[in-house]
Amino acid sequence: METVKQLNKQEFTTKVADIEKSKGEWKFLGERPAVIDFFATWCGPCKALAPVLDELAADYQYKDRIDFYKVDIDQEQDLAAVFGVRSVPILLFIPLNGMPQMMTGGRPKSDLKRIIDEVLMGK
């Protein structure tokens, strides 16, 4: 079972935000908080971060019900441009209410768990 689902632009516009219709205005379409990993297949730090995100996705999948997605910036250049992604990895944390927050670079699992708990779960 895939714990971190890769999204293309069409899936992103139905599961996360319709970036075509809501230019300049954030409207989250998801039913659960989400974490999105902007990555590249050639990126060493992205490869190191991937298993950590898989572990977190498994940890939060049932307990707190958070969706984990990934976007390949080489395949989905439009999405990367919308979010100003110029380096990878970049993580986008999307709470149910409020504005999303971006974080650059890979972090240890403990740091990511703390950020998820604070930003997405309000703990």
Task: Name the predicted role of every residue range.
Residues M1-T13, E55, D117, M121-K123:
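N-terminal targeting signals for export/organelle localization
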Residues V35-I36, F68, L91:
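Hydrophobic beta-strand anchors of alpha/beta hydrolase catalytic cores
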Residues S87-K123:
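Non-catalytic, surface beta->alpha helical segment in thiol-disulfide oxidoreductase systems
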Residues E31-R32, F39-W42, S87:
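Short pre-active-site segment immediately N-terminal to redox-active cysteine/selenocysteine motifs
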Residues K47-Q61:
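Typically the conserved alpha-helix immediately C-terminal to a functionally engaged Cys/Sec
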